[in-house]
Structure formats: C-alpha cells, structure tokens
C-alpha cells in the first residue's frame, strides 16, 4: 500500500494577507498573520526537515509543496472565477486540491500543516484506521460559542 505525508508552504505576499485582528491589535504590535508569516519563513528549513525525518522513520514518501508554477496557475484560475476569495482561503482550497491529486497515486495520505512538528515515532498510519474514512482530530471544545464572537475577535479560536 502506497503511503505519503505531505505539507506545503505558501508564502502569501504581505499585500494579500488578511489582517483579521486589525481592529483589536495594540498600537505598534505586529499583526498575528504577519508574525506567523515571519516565523514560518525564519523556521522554514527546520519545519521541512522534521517532517522529512518523520516520513523516513515510517518508511513513507514525503512531498513538500511550495509557491510554484502549479500553485500560481491554481491561484490565477481561482482569482478569475472567484475574485472575492482571499489568498488565505485559496491556499486552503489548494490543500484539498493536493489531497485529491495525491489520492490518484497513494492509498493512505497524511497532511501536516506546515507549522506541525511530529513528536512521536509512532506511525500515524498504524495508529489510525484509515479504512473507515478520513481521520480528523476534533477540537470543538476549544471553540468559542457564537455569542462570544464579536466584531473585534473575528475568530472562533
């Protein structure tokens, strides 16, 4: 059975970032999205290496996707057809697109967000029964109730 771990890093241009915290950020503070962008860039190679290492321990393929011609074409098409969709959301749709494409070659697929650092030697593919379908870690206990979301919070986390 063919197995793969994949991740991707799309360095969204600063001009396209969705500054969701602009109404609540303290004066002089770095917006969350910009800080995240900076930290991901600063730790880019370490974040790739830890995922490669995990895949190697499991004996599975690892594929890293980045801001390449395929993504540029995908984004261009998306912008043409859905101009109101933000770059951040296009990146999330691309994640699903990649999953679909990888499913043509691989039986079992693990997607890791770029900021995830595997901290176990246990095989995800042995621990989770993927024959039952998609595995999603549920964390709704950490979500804010809708009445606690304000125009200044803009998020459920």
Where do the language-model regions lie?
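Conserved beta strand-loop-helix elements of the APE1-like EEP
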Residues: 156-157
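GT-A fold catalytic core of metal-dependent nucleotide-sugar glycosyltransferases
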Residues: 86-153
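N-terminal anchoring/stem segment of glycosyltransferases
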Residues: 1-94, 104-105
């Amino acid at each position: 059975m063919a197995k793969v771990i994949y991740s991707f890093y799309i360095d969204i241009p600063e001009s396209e970032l969705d500054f969701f915290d602009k109404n609540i950020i303290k004066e002089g503070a770095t917006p969350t999205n910009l800080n995240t962008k900076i930290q991901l860039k600063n730790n880019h190679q370490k974040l790739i290496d830890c995922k490669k290492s995990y895949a190697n321990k499991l004996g599975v393929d690892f594929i890293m996707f980045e801001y390449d011609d395929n993504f540029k074409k995908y984004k261009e098409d998306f912008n043409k057809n859905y101009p109101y969709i933000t770059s951040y959301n296009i990146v999330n749709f691309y994640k699903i697109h990649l999953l679909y494409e990888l499913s043509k070659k691989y039986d079992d697929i693990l997607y890791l967000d770029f900021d995830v650092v595997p901290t176990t030697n246990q095989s995800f593919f042995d621990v989770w029964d993927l024959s039952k379908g998609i595995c999603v870690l549920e964390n709704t206990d950490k979500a804010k109730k809708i009445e606690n979301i304000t125009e200044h919070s803009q998020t459920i986390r």
